[in-house]
Amino acid sequence: MTTQFSVAGIELELFRYPASQESNLQAWDAADEHLINTLVEGGQTAVPTAIINDNFGALSCALSRLTPDWPLNVETDARTSFLGAEQNHLRNQLPMDNLTWFTSRDALPGDLALVLMKLPKNLTYFAHQLMRLSQVLPAGCKVLVGAKAKSINASLLEVFAKYLGPASASLAWKKTRVITCISDGKPRALPKEITWDIPEFNLHISNLSNVFAANKLDIGARIMLDNLPQGDFKTIVDLGCGNGVLGLRAAQLYPNANIHFIDDSEMAVASAKANWANNQLPAEKGHFHWDDCMTHLPDGVEPDLVLCNPPFHQGEAITDHIAWQMFLDARRRLKNGGILHIVGNRHLAYHVKLQRLFKNCTTVASNGKFVILQAQR
């Protein structure tokens, strides 16, 4: 893994978060470099700036290195992005009093004069971000968006025009382009939450824009809901909860249990919390954590059941380190005799990892694509 960032005279040491990941993944990409080069070559001065979707702080660290008092407003939906940026600022002895942190639901400041963004994988979420910007940016404000060249097309430029203002793309550099959008100063209304029902379980679901499986039950969750374990569980963790559908069903099946919902996405945790309330479940039994797996779960929480539908993407990167960390955290936090109950694509071979960690693994159910596995501490 390359950790030495060297662009436009800026030298940094940058790590992904957590730092112990696959050696072929690094904390920035060529689109980050392209954005920084564009700013430096254009002679950009330190004005109030929003940095959005900065995976591990490459952009905020670079601007802080250029000008230590550059006023930066950093927006992220991912807890790991926040923690990664924080660690990289500390590692490079950069100031942090010039930084203000925002989630993707917080109101952005009204004095922004520049926006730097990375194009996220979820374009519904991206459109939502543009609409949020339209509510605070003055006419003429410049928004620079870095992306892979193959991701930029006429349809994407139309999204800019619809939700923020006219846009054009730069020439390609290292297979990336920078889109320059000029705000038209016209505020757009934010989209309503997506809502849908799962009638067979009597559940009403709502999703914010950056939540996986936005308007339907994904196939992995479906097979999981049909094969939840039997038992008198007292403390349950829905790890990587998304909209919380597994934990919601668990609350129906195990009414005496406290359910803890955990996700790296703040929008996912907010969606799970809203769904808990909307399905009229007891407020004192639902607990919600925006966290990197179970890193900061309170010490007194000892689950006897962990439900998990692990992701195998972190941003644009395909990686199994998140699943591995989830399994490690489950083994560490489960009480003796507690159960880890997971669903995954068959080809990911999670049974090998569970057997290695727990010294046992049982196949509960499977179909052509997915398998449900169970391991006991």
UniProtKB/Swiss-Prot annotation:
It catalyses: guanosine(1835) in 23S rRNA + S-adenosyl-L-methionine = N(2)-methylguanosine(1835) in 23S rRNA + S-adenosyl-L-homocysteine + H(+). Its main location: cytoplasm. The keyword S-adenosyl-L-methionine applies. One of its GO terms (cellular component) is cytoplasm. One of its GO terms (molecular function) is nucleic acid binding. Keywords: Cytoplasm, Methyltransferase, rRNA processing, S-adenosyl-L-methionine, Transferase. It holds the Pfam family MTS. It is found in: Cytoplasm. Specifically methylates the guanine in position 1835 (m2G1835) of 23S rRNA. This is Ribosomal RNA large subunit methyltransferase G. It comes from Shewanella sp. (strain MR-4). The gene is rlmG.
